[in-house]
């Protein structure tokens, strides 16, 4: 039997049948706007802000387990001159949400070029086999935040090996786990 992708593991679920969870971090932009945020929301924002500031001109950025692509607004304002952003996620629903929420203006995916000064795209796939959908040596900067804890250890290890495959020789990686 194939393992399932689930939103989150609930009481009574057989964990051996779960491939990964797709539960996402809260949208810290909305949390701050509404005045209801936690230390975790602040930590997530700081991590994303730090990663955006590390991005340099000409870089191809890959956001591993991108969820709703909360990196995009920060990259737009703080990562001047990057070449591209590619978000990778195993969940079609997460990618659809990322595409819908890519701007406050709710642009259609085909109109993102008018809003972002770099190429924006998403890839659906398992990060444990990421080099099947992202060319080896493509990424100049890999951002991998708050995701390893959502998958089995073997897949987590495989995903790190896959990150190295898609990274260019001088690439950077921003990796975090809560």
Language-model segments: which ranges?
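A short acidic, Gly/Pro-enriched loop at the edge of an enzyme's catalytic core
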Residues: 132-142
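A short glycine-rich, Lys/Arg-flanked "PGG" loop and its adjoining helix->strand segment in the class I
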Residues: 157-169
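Class I (Rossmann-like) S-adenosyl-L-methionine-dependent methyltransferase catalytic domain
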Residues: 1-54, 58-59, 64-131, 174-178
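A short beta-strand submotif of the Rossmann-like class I SAM-dependent methyltransferase core
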Residues: 144-147
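A short His-aromatic
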Residues: 149-151
């Amino acid at each position: 039997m194939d393992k399932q992708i689930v939103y989150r593991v609930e009481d009574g679920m057989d964990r051996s049948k779960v491939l990964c969870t797709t539960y996402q971090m809260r949208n810290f932009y909305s949390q701050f706007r509404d005045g209801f945020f936690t230390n975790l929301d602040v930590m997530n924002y700081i991590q994303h802000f730090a990663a955006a500031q590390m991005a340099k001109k000409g870089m191809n950025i890959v956001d591993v387990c991108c969820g709703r692509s909360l990196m995009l607004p920060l990259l737009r304002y703080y990562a001047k001159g990057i070449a591209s952003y590619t978000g990778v996620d195993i969940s079609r629903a997460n990618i659809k949400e990322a595409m819908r929420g890519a701007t406050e203006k709710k642009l259609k995916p085909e109109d993102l070029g008018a809003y972002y000064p770099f190429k924006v795209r998403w890839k659906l796939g398992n990060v444990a086999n990421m080099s099947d959908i992202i060319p080896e040596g493509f990424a100049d900067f890999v951002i991998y935040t708050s995701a390893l804890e959502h998958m089995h250890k073997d897949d987590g290890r495989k995903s790190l090996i896959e990150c190295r495959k898609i990274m260019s020789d001088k690439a950077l990686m921003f990796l975090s786990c809560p």
